[in-house]
UniProtKB/Swiss-Prot annotation:
GO terms for molecular function: protein-macromolecule adaptor activity. Disulfide bonds: none annotated. It comes from the Bacteria. Homodimer. The N-terminal domain probably binds unfolded/aggregated proteins; the C-terminal domain interacts with ClpC. Belongs to the MecA family. It comes from Streptococcus pneumoniae (strain Hungary19A-6). This is Adapter protein MecA. It holds the Pfam family MecA. The gene is mecA. Enables the recognition and targeting of unfolded and aggregated proteins to the ClpC protease or to other proteins involved in proteolysis.
């Protein structure tokens, strides 16, 4: 469970499905407002370390955004206290002026003062909607980028001499799926297929840098080698080269 303060009046609490289960809740509980849900919200607020701006009394509104694997709860603090204090409404006239006002005039003045106080709440809600929209766009972009990420990479290395190729093969200790050896235009080309799915994002670049200490990186694609090159070893080329000498 994570909490993020978006503004002075808004918090975002993110809970995983496991967080909900641990507290006896499920996503369906948020679909229909009920006393259990409200009690759960306030229990979460007690559990978390609240910012000072949320510690004073005031009405809190809760907005729930369910996701497939989590729930985002936006907590907005109203600037109108639950127990409205006329002293907080600075636009109200003093007692002498109140005595001269008709009931209709008093109600209109009171409504104006409250409207001014709730302006910040409306702006907070609008800001919250913008934050939600941006976060949804960011999450969608991250999901699309993740879906486009290839779990495998073919590295293609070029060697001028067979001896250099064999020497490189003997340095290989990283895991690979397979490797191929081609010859084209009097040069040797080694393709190495590596599974990067369970590795951190910098791993492919780190691995290439390590390979380039012993070999030249090639711009020639594997499809070109397959079409125009001579296949010397169609699989496990590195393992076979390691056996030489």
């Amino acid at each position: 469970m994570k909490m993020k303060q978006i503004s002075d009046t808004t918090l975002k609490i993110t809970m995983s499905l496991e967080d909900l289960m641990d507290r006896g809740m499920e996503i369906a509980d948020f679909l229909v407002p009920q006393e259990k849900t409200e009690e759960f919200f306030y229990a979460i607020l007690d559990e978390l370390e609240m910012p000072d701006s949320f510690l004073d009394t005031g009405m809190l509104s809760f907005r729930v955004t369910p996701k497939p694997d989590k729930v985002d709860v936006f907590v907005t603090k109203s600037k109108i206290d639950q127990n409205l204090d006329f002293e907080d409404l600075s636009d109200l006239p003093d007692m002498e002026e109140l005595a001269q006002m008709s009931p209709d005039e008093f109600i209109k003045t009171l409504e104006k003062s409250i409207a001014d106080k709730t302006k910040d709440d409306i702006e907070a809600i609008q800001s919250l909607e913008q934050v939600e929209a941006k976060e949804e766009e960011q999450e969608q972009a991250e999901q699309e980028a993740e879906s486009k990420k290839e779990p495998y990479i073919y590295y293609i290395l070029s060697f001028a001499k067979l001896a250099d190729l064999v020497a490189f093969a003997k340095t290989v200790t990283f895991e690979m799926e397979t490797s191929e050896l081609y010859k084209m235009n009097e040069r040797y080309y080694l393709t190495i297929l590596v599974d990067i799915e369970n590795h951190p994002s910098p791993y492919p670049a780190w691995l290439l840098a390590r390979m380039r200490e012993f070999a030249d990186d090639s711009d020639i694609s594997r499809s070109v080698l397959q079409e125009y090159g001579q296949v010397l070893m169609s699989h496990d080329a590195v393992l076979n080269l390691q056996k030489i000498g």
